[in-house]
């Protein structure tokens, strides 16, 4: 196939990829004209019909010998980096094209790619009508299997009529196989529209990769593993019409044995060894002389489907089949006998235990499920220990143990007869010994409809025991006669081998009133037998005595205790970290509670405790859990705790009934007052251009600011000369005086020391009041009292009242008015205190005002 490809930039800036499959004997052209089949726009360097081309089939039937002829009509055209002249012709042979040929058009340039794709398809004989159309678009077709390798195989499998030799050839040669529907759709839709629909590459790739057109669903690469099943099987055939069959099977290392006729094939089969597998290939599927004959199509289908054993024969398979049938019948009969044979009861003689084992405590095997995920096993150990010790009791030579079958049908109907039969031997023993009281009770615990997985059925059955026989009280339900203390048979069958819980467990029958009374009687007898101490009872191997013997042993007892303590400690540790999740804990509401969850180490200090009326600490969570039916917030979660922010009581008391923002506002207002009093601020003005910190005139102002910053933390003595400070203040007043226009007129301002708040600026809240001259005496008294309070603090603080010599008109009027008012008040104040004499207090401020009136 000849395919031309190029890309073009459209008006909107997007790139269009164009590909077209060329039809034989048809002329194509590329240019800016819309009459061209292939159009290139938005490039003035390309002619309206820049280049024309067509391909032709030579006299040879092989399409590889076809050629593509190019005619250049444009000004800027280069082929393989060489410019072509206008009207120049160039021919490209398909056999010489190893890679695509590229032609560049225009100044940009636009690359045009011409490629020859060699396509050889093998089609069935009944689809030859498509060969002409396929050849026009450069696709070669073959019908028979020859040495020319094919790129694609068209098949009608499994409806093929050629014995599926073509499919076998395709599988062996790993040639993709497509259905005949693929060929029809390609010739009817894709190829005819390739001239108008310039997206040939996309449509071609979509059809080739579509799995709907595949004959087999599996990957051809795994076909080798499927044919490997024939390696150990001999393939026999009488087909002579397929000469390539042997070479195809030899590809998978399969040996094919060909015979002239079927008789010679049977003779070869008879000469084979026993249990040899072989496969017979013929022209028809049939079964003859007990042998399976199949065709190539059937063999291929069985290999692909994995049912190859259905067509394989084996030498001597018939005799082996009979033997297998007999063996199956025998095995079925034996299984039936084993299922039906079952002993209901087995009588066993008492087991004599070794004396050495009496001094050793039994260590039960570790149950991994109970050890790692279960609870403490102290209860289970006590039950197993008591049952084991009870089995070891030696109750005499005539005693027998009755082992009941674990499966007893209709247990509810046999409960009462079983207890009655169990009580009969006691009366017989009483008669033989000369006593009228009941005797031994044979204790048996068959499985009465209940299932207990923790104990074996043999462990549930207990040995028959006899009761000790000192004078006993009357027992209701058993008899009214007393039991004497002289019978040794009663002593050897003491029921004290079981505690109250075990007796009730062995005789427990749900919802049965006839068994409740005997169990109570036995409990009374067992309780009474524990209080008896006699020489006969000492000889009896009771669990109490045996336990005391075990406790006397040193090393084994300590070893067992260490094992049990380790197990219990590990179980507690695992249970503290592994908990069971409930369905309620996985709901969305429960998961949302985790946002206030914090995982901490378990500690008693984290639990908030309350005090009761007597002053003792009690846990609130425990009382809440005991008094209510609801579970706590994090039940059984020791390391879960919900933290709630609690405000201190002092702040809560102050802010009670107030808005939460008032506290922050109070702090912000207080900070504003502090910064306003101690940080000099300057109002920005466009007209204020005289103040420059780089000039020499402002050196005193900068020094004054530095003194204010460090003055609050600097303690100075009274002996420091104040003339330096007075000179700096006078220099400062020269810059800040608004009436500096009058020559020779200047305000002299001096003071000896700043004491308290008398010389400082009034607070903000007092600035709204105007002080009258009549109240200056009261102010002087207040300032004297404040000076006495701060005698120990000798701080020199200089306040800068106005550092801006040139202000706006509005600011100058305000400052002049305030300064004149202050001058008058201070002048009168200084005049009144000027003639006080030396008796005045030296700590008070001394002011002197001089002003010339012009």
Curated annotation (Swiss-Prot):
Q: What GO biological process terms are annotated to this protein in UniProt?
A: base-excision repair; double-strand break repair; double-strand break repair via nonhomologous end joining; maintenance of DNA trinucleotide repeats; meiotic DNA double-strand break formation; mitochondrial double-strand break repair via homologous recombination; R-loop processing; sporulation resulting in formation of a cellular spore
Biased-composition ranges for Polar residues?
A: 444-455
Primary localization:
nucleus
Q: Region (Disordered) spans which residues?
A: 429-455, 807-854
Q: Which residues are reported to carry the modification Phosphoserine?
A: 349, 533-534, 553
Q: Which domain of life is it from?
A: Eukaryota
The terms under GO molecular function for this entry are: DNA binding; double-stranded telomeric DNA binding; G-quadruplex DNA binding; protein-macromolecule adaptor activity; single-stranded telomeric DNA binding; telomeric DNA binding
UniProt GO cellular component terms = chromosome, telomeric region; Mre11 complex; nucleoplasm; nucleus
Every FHA domain range: 28-50
Question: Where is the signal peptide, in residue numbers?
Answer: none
Q: Which residues carry this modification: Phosphothreonine?
A: 555
Low complexity bias: where? 820-832
- Where in the cell does this protein reside? Nucleus; Chromosome; Chromosome, Telomere
**SUPFAM superfamilies the record matches:** SMAD/FHA domain
Which keywords annotate this record?
Chromosome, DNA damage, DNA repair, Meiosis, Nucleus, Phosphoprotein, Telomere
Under Gene3D superfamilies, the record lists: 2.60.200.20
Subunit structure, as described in the record: Component of the MRN complex composed of two heterodimers RAD50 and MRE11 associated with a single XRS2. The MRN complexes dimerize on DNA to form joined MRN-MRN oligomers required for DNA double-strand break repair.
Purpose of the protein: Component of the MRN complex, which plays a central role in double-strand break (DSB) repair, DNA recombination, maintenance of telomere integrity and meiosis. The MRN complex is involved in the repair of DNA double-strand breaks (DSBs) via homologous recombination (HR), an error-free mechanism which primarily occurs during S and G2 phases. The complex (1) mediates the end resection of damaged DNA, which generates proper single-stranded DNA, a key initial steps in HR, and is (2) required for the recruitment of other repair factors and efficient activation of ATM and ATR upon DNA damage.
What else is noted? Present with 358 molecules/cell in log phase SD medium.
Q: What is this protein called?
A: DNA repair protein XRS2
Recorded name of the encoding gene: XRS2
